[in-house]
C-alpha cells in the first residue's frame, strides 16, 4: 500500500458490482454508464441429449454445503416447471454435484441431468434457457450477466451486497439463515416468465 499514490472512497453499503465500477471509474477518471452491461456473448450450444424445447436451467451446486437448497424443494420446483412447459436441465461440476443433479432429475419425469460440461457448453445451455434458478454460485451471476431471467437462492449469506445484479430480470430470494420456499421460488418464476 505504501507504493499507491492515489486513494479513492466508495460507499461500502453499495452492491459489490456498483462499488467496483465506481472505484474503477474514479481510478481511471471516467464516469461509468448507468446501464449495467457485462458485454458477454455466448455461442449457441446443441447436444443430442439436450431437448429442443424451452429450457429452465437449475443450478443446484455451490461451493459450500450451507449454501445448498434442499433437494426436496428442487424436486417441487422442477415438477412445476415441467407443468409450465419447460424442461429442467441440471448441470453439476464435479461427481458429487452431478450425483445430486441426477437424483433430482430421476425424481422428476422429463428433467435432464447434464453430463460433465465445460464452462463454454454450460454457458451455452444457460444462454438458451428461458429461466435460470440457482443457489449462491457464480453460474447464477453468469445467467444474470447473460440477461436470462434469474432467481438466485440464498440460504447462508445476505445477497444485499453480493447477490445477482444485472440489467435483465433478476430476483434474489432468501438470505442468511432464511432459505426461500419452493412456493416463493415458483411465484417469482411466474413473474420472471411473464417479464
Residue ranges and their predicted role:
Residues 1-195:
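Catalytic machinery of carbohydrate-active enzymes
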Amino acid at each position: 500500500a505504501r507504493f499507491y499514490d492515489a486513494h479513492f472512497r466508495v460507499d461500502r453499503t453499495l452492491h459489490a458490482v456498483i462499488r467496483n465500477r465506481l472505484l474503477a471509474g474514479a481510478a481511471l477518471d471516467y464516469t461509468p454508464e448507468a446501464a449495467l452491461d457485462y458485454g458477454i456473448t455466448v455461442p449457441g450450444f446443441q447436444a443430442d441429449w439436450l431437448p429442443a424445447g424451452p429450457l429452465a436451467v437449475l443450478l443446484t451446486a455451490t461451493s459450500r454445503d450451507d449454501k445448498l437448497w434442499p433437494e426436496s424443494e428442487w424436486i417441487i420446483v422442477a415438477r412445476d416447471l415441467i407443468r409450465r412447459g419447460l424442461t429442467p436441465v441440471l448441470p453439476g461440476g464435479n461427481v458429487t454435484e452431478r450425483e445430486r443433479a441426477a437424483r433430482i432429475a430421476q425424481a422428476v419425469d422429463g428433467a435432464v441431468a447434464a453430463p460433465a460440461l465445460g464452462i463454454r457448453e454450460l454457458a451455452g445451455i444457460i444462454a438458451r434457457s428461458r429461466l435460470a434458478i440457482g443457489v449462491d454460485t457464480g453460474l447464477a451471476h453468469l445467467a444474470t450477466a447473460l440477461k436470462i431471467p434469474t432467481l438466485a437462492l440464498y440460504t447462508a449469506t445476505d445477497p444485499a451486497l453480493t447477490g445477482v445484479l444485472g440489467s435483465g430480470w433478476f430476483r434474489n430470494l432468501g438470505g442468511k439463515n432464511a432459505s426461500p420456499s419452493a412456493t416463493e421460488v415458483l411465484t417469482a418464476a411466474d413473474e420472471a416468465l411473464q417479464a
